[in-house]
């Protein structure tokens, strides 16, 4: 392999890499604790909003880009299929807007990528639905426009953000901002944990688990 851009290291520098493991995982754990302590009430409120939507025959729409798109798909699968095998419940309707490549590419080609999620919210969104918008920076134009469309249509909105919240700060009915800037990874780790807690709480609120 070419080494012009490689740092000094080595495959067998175990002590150095042990430090990396500890630094990354312990920082992530501290960040999780901060998010939990600062946002427990809003997380409960988000879960209640979602549970009330399901109780009123609504559904959840989710959108994000890159790793946030993967998180959106992850959560949609846990709602529609199953979160834990020990809990028997009906399917809960959730759609990740990043999964239909034909719609995404048609929208990007015909309307511009910034408008693709908004167009899908316009197509699928109804009054009792909830949009969960994920952006590690809070500055994703496509996610911001989806949030704007959801509000115009009367959907309830949740934003999971990072850093200082970016342009999306203050736009959603409920928001959670992970206080980490400079990289998306630590923010995404907190987002997916929050989403798991949301699914857990929604199942409890709907009476599917104690």
Swiss-Prot record:
Class of the enzyme per the UniProt entry, highest EC level: isomerase
Chain sites annotated for binding substrate: 65-67, 78, 109-110, 135-137, 140, 188
Cysteines paired by S-S bonds: none
Pfam families documented for this protein: SIS_2
Keyword field: Carbohydrate metabolism, Cytoplasm, Isomerase, Metal-binding, Zinc
Note on how the cofactor is bound: Binds 1 zinc ion per subunit.
EC number: 5.3.1.28
Main location: cytoplasm
Compartments it resides in: Cytoplasm
InterPro entries per the UniProt record, alphabetical: GmhA/DiaA, Phosphoheptose_Isoase, SIS_dom, SIS_dom_sf, SIS_GmhA/DiaA_subfam
UniProt similarity note: Belongs to the SIS family. GmhA subfamily.
Protein name: Phosphoheptose isomerase
Protein species of origin: Chlorobium chlorochromatii (strain CaD3)
